[in-house]
Amino acid sequence: MSSAPEPPTFKKEPPKEKDFQSPGLRGVRTTTLFRAVNPELFIKPNKPVMAFGLVTLSLCVAYIGYLHATQENKKDLYEAIDSEGHSYMRRKTSKWD
């Protein structure tokens, strides 16, 4: 019975210290101009500020949706005055209905 030869084992060399100064883009060599133009790539994320921005943006979108909904409701109403002088809101009707 012949046994299959064992595959050669490759030794993984530990990474050199000078190769990995820090993970991600902070360790990449770049110019000062690139870092000045793109600071968000090199600054640690600030989670409270991100949460505040997400809540603010969500509230703005909700407010725009609210304004759109109320504008749609107001578009079909007008103020009518009856023969006695009382005013009331009335929905517009088409002449074709």
From Swiss-Prot:
Keywords: Membrane, Transmembrane, Transmembrane helix. Residues 1-24 are annotated as: Disordered. Pfam families: DUF4500. It is a single-pass membrane protein. The keyword Transmembrane helix applies. It is found in: Membrane. InterPro entries: UPF0708. The chain crosses the membrane at residues 48-67. GO terms for cellular component: membrane. Its main location: membrane. Residues 9-20 have a biased composition (Basic and acidic residues). Belongs to the SMIM8 family. This is Small integral membrane protein 8. It comes from Pongo abelii.
